[in-house]
Amino acid sequence: MAIIIGADKAGQELKEVIKDYLKEGKYEVVDVSENEVRDFVDTTLAVAKEVNASEDNLGIVIDAYGVGSFMVATKIKGMVAAEVSDERSAYMTRGHNNARIITLGSEISAPGIAKNIIKGFVEGKYDGGRHQVRVDMLNKMC
């Protein structure tokens, strides 16, 4: 599993904190905005492309408020994404919704909270079962 991460200009500082945190946890991290800072639309599309390259990959996109990146991610066929600003939602969106991308706002989530959000997301596992009906509905929408 690789964690694909990207950020626009507003999210670069928080992205580096999260990237370091993930690397300390021995996760494979792919930064799609390491060499070129792009708009959140292009960054989100780049993250989603890499997430879709492997069923095990997860994605994290950071912009100022998390909303713009979320809107882009939800337009991608087969992608379930969640905008999160707390630890429990990050964990539950993996378990119940099989979200493969989360978006965060650097103006919303402080570094300590962001690390806990990331922990919940990457450690969460999809529960399947009764939740699959909802995931199937989401996947039919795009």
UniProtKB/Swiss-Prot annotation:
Gene that specifies this protein: lacA2
InterPro entries: LacA (IPR004783), RpiB_LacA_LacB (IPR003500), RpiB_LacA_LacB_sf (IPR036569)
Enzyme class: isomerase
Pfam families: LacAB_rpiB
E.C. number(s) listed in UniProt: 5.3.1.26
This protein's UniProt keywords: Isomerase, Lactose metabolism
Keyword Cytoplasm: no
Family under the similarity heading: Belongs to the LacAB/RpiB family.
Pathway, per record: Carbohydrate metabolism; D-galactose 6-phosphate degradation; D-tagatose 6-phosphate from D-galactose 6-phosphate: step 1/1
Catalytic activity: aldehydo-D-galactose 6-phosphate = keto-D-tagatose 6-phosphate
Record-level Gene Ontology MF annotations: galactose-6-phosphate isomerase activity; ribose-5-phosphate isomerase activity
Protein known as: Galactose-6-phosphate isomerase subunit LacA 2
Statement: the UniProt record of this protein carries the keyword Zinc-finger: no
GO BP annotations listed: D-allose catabolic process; galactose catabolic process; lactose catabolic process via tagatose-6-phosphate; pentose-phosphate shunt, non-oxidative branch
PANTHER family: GALACTOSE-6-PHOSPHATE ISOMERASE SUBUNIT LACA, RIBOSE-5-PHOSPHATE ISOMERASE B
UniProt subunit comment: Heteromultimeric protein consisting of LacA and LacB.
Cysteine pairings via disulfide bonds: none
